[in-house]
Amino acid sequence: MKDIKEDLFKAQEHISNAIEHINEIEKLKEKPNVPFPTNSIPRDDLNVAICVGHSRKGDTGAVSCGGINEWTYNKKVAEYLKSDLQEYGISSFVVDDYGGTYGSYTSAMNWLIKHLKKEKASIAIELHFNASSNSKANGMEMLYWNASRIGLSLAEYLLRGCQKYFPLIRNRGTKSRKSGDRGATFLRGTHCPACIAEPFFGTNFEPDWTTFANNEHVLSQAFATGIKQWSDEHIIL
């Protein structure tokens, strides 16, 4: 009898998860519910900065269940994304080697902020994957600066693109950041709207890592779709 009850509980859990995933897929049919920004970016000026997280000297980021670090994984995503955006007629450039003092996060961010302005980036995305000491932590989320309305809209569309391509991955939503929070220096400091992409937990084997391992190009297509839809439907004149 005990085994039967355990099997029933597991079956109920699987059914609940399936219903949750179906609801997430249904939400994709709707446009993200975000306020319309007060300013827009002309299409001809759209220049996407694709920043590979942990590109500062002496840093490669967290390591996934498969032994691949953040920088190595996202370097591939960045190169694919640049090509995918080009197919959409959207200009972009990759930043995968931050300047600054060795080992200094602040110095690297100061260099990156100046570099993005010099390259006339109109939006900036920094690519990461999440990590946790709790191997069960999973799902995708996008971070934006709490006072940036365009940053919020960009985060929503990137999340929407990822949900379209990876519908079975938990949606943790968009998350605002304020001073002192993780990622705040990048999100606040850039002259343009910015977003930090955390599409999965590299420290979660199932479902996150098994879904995203060797799928760098699928992930880049998800990001490109989000950027394209954002530019078509929400911001660009």
Language-model segment annotations:
Residues 24-111:
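Active-site histidine-acidic residue metal-binding/catalytic motifs
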Residues 54-57, 98-102, 129-134, 147-150, ...:
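Solvent-exposed loop/turn segments at secondary-structure junctions
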Residues 57-69, 130-162:
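A short, glycine/acidic-enriched catalytic loop
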Residues 62-72, 97-102, 140-149, 205-214:
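Second-shell loop/turn segments in exported
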Residues 75-78, 82, 109, 113, ...:
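Extracytoplasmic/secreted envelope proteins and their assembly/folding machinery
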Residues 46-49, 124-126, 175-237:
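Active-site-adjacent mobile loop/cap segments within catalytic or ligand-binding domains
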Residues 105-121, 184-190:
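Mature extracellular/periplasmic domains of secretome proteins
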Residues 8, 15, 22-25, 29:
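Generic L/I/V-rich hydrophobic alpha-helical segments across diverse proteins
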